[in-house]
């Protein structure tokens, strides 16, 4: 059964690895007209499949695919008045179209290791995320699928599918991102780093 679950369109049909020095592009909501338009002036980094309950997922998919760009590389270039924050209490302020519900970007305004990075979904571009954007690098928050109703017995099969696609999968973020979070927290707390224990 898990082999037939739709993971995400950028995973189910094979992973595109993108183009070096991809310059970015435009992302759009799903409205038929007067679309919200986001312009990105860089490629994404840390593009990954996310199983958390907060990220926007295409209809029928159990994962989102989300990457980050520097906040300075993102601008709303059309129909900004259609955007609203989904949950003002969440660390990531997810801006969604009030009409179609698609999340266009997430921004962190509070002190946080990822402040200065915006979270985006490259499949919202005209090429569906395959025209040059960084490919999916790993899968995070896989166990979170259970809390959203996925039968726990299916999760091992989901993990096997992810591995067959060449994706390591975690129940948090990838080790380099977890190290970045720990480093940020340690610096904030005044920890002095030493070269040996």
From Swiss-Prot:
UniProt-listed InterPro entries: CENP-V/GFA, Formald_GSH, Mss4-like_sf
UniProt xrefs under PROSITE patterns: CENP_V_GFA (PS51891)
A single BP term in Gene Ontology: formaldehyde catabolic process
Presence of the UniProt keyword tRNA-binding in the record: no
Pfam families: GFA
Binding site for Zn(2+) 1: 29, 31, 97, 100
Domain CENP-V/GFA, chain residue ranges per copy: 22-171
Catalysed reaction equations from the record: S-(hydroxymethyl)glutathione = glutathione + formaldehyde
Positions annotated to bind Zn(2+) 2: 50, 52, 55
Enzyme class name: lyase
Cofactor(s) the protein needs: Zn(2+)
EC number assigned by the record: 4.4.1.22
Cofactor, how bound (note): Binds 2 Zn(2+) ions per subunit.
Pathway: One-carbon metabolism; formaldehyde degradation; formate from formaldehyde (glutathione route): step 1/3
Keywords for the protein's UniProt record, in alphabetical order: Lyase, Metal-binding, Zinc
GO molecular function, one term: zinc ion binding
HAMAP family listed in its UniProt record: Formald_GSH
Known role: Catalyzes the condensation of formaldehyde and glutathione to S-hydroxymethylglutathione.
Similarity annotation: Belongs to the Gfa family.
Name the UniProt record assigns to this protein: Putative glutathione-dependent formaldehyde-activating enzyme
